[in-house]
Amino acid sequence: LSERSAFANAVKDAGLVWIGPSAHAIDEMGDKISARRAMIEAGVPVIPGEELPLDQPDDMVDELVRAATRVGYPLLLKASAGGGGKGMRVVREPRNLQREYAAASREATTSFGDGTVYVERMLEKSRHVEVQVLCDSHGNAVHLFERECSIQRRHQKVVEEAPSPVLDEQTRMSMGEAAVNAARAVDYEGAGTVEFLLAEDGDFHFLEMNTRLQVEHPITECISGTDLVVEQIRVAAGLKLPFTQDDLSIRGHAIEVRIYAEDPSNGFLPAIGPLALFRPPSGPGIRLDTGVREGDEARIDFDPMLAKLIVHAPNRDAAIRRMKRACEDFVLLGVTTNLGFLCDIMGHTAYHAGDTTTDFIEVNWPEGWTQKTSDIAPFVAAAAEQFGLSRKTALVETSEGRGS
């Protein structure tokens, strides 16, 4: 509902205050083709691409081939109304073009009720970097720096950090200004995120704008000292932003990991089962955002994300160490999760080096990820606590095969 203009209008028509951007801004940025047009007009750099004419269905195949030839391979077919990786297909060879176009359009129609697809150049070895913006109704707009969200599976984010480990100050400033210009182009109000792809050569290109608070907004709150939920409520109340761009600065480094009920060793397929034990870590610089508790059940009816684990530290190295320890200390039994995979990312030399392009998972686990044999001690301890046994008794029963 957060990105549906009809809902925004319905809230206002009911005499309530809508917390978020206008229906116009939601519509303009919710459609990727109209967003591209608006960004081009505003002077914001976009990824080279081609729209496909909707008024010439008989010539669609020929036009698709011509558009793909102009853009060049490899390319992306993207749903105009898409999001979350749905309605998106990579095409590396012309012979796969028509098949992937049909699949992308079909998935887009099923997911969004709109099968419109356009062609976009695929920027390989790129990074997904996004900028948080905040705008009021008095013409004031600021950015709260960037987040890097390059580590993804199925075009969905797994690990996010702020700030990006590779941006220099000039690029950070230019990207922030571009994000503010993008928001101003649609008279944006409230909190929003402008997403960019950062190419190997350092150029960045507009990807899309999310007209809502995103999953990863806590890491921006950590490094900026700003409560984004409070600020968007203040904006909705008609108040001015309490700070200017010059008042904002980056404070330390923050990392967020998304804890999913899924099996990373089996293509990241969603998993189901009970949350028999759910014991998150705690301590200085650790935050958990979740909507589940011990005893709940992960089911196929909902998104597999169980929680967001966030850490904040004075610098990136300290943040990585804190996150690795937090992932190791997180006790979550009863359903398969990606916690082991997240631990391995935090311990990977490529991640420590900041070598985090969007193909990070495919490059570093080309044959897929496999679960390491775990020390049974923490599981025994958790089981003992759950069932009221002494750790020694639980260990004996587990070793003899009579318990778990």
Language-model features: locations:
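N-terminal beta-alpha lobe that positions the nucleotide/phosphoryl donor
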Residues: 1-194, 198-217
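Catalytic cores of soluble metabolic enzymes centered on carboxylation/carboxyl-transfer
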Residues: 179, 218-404
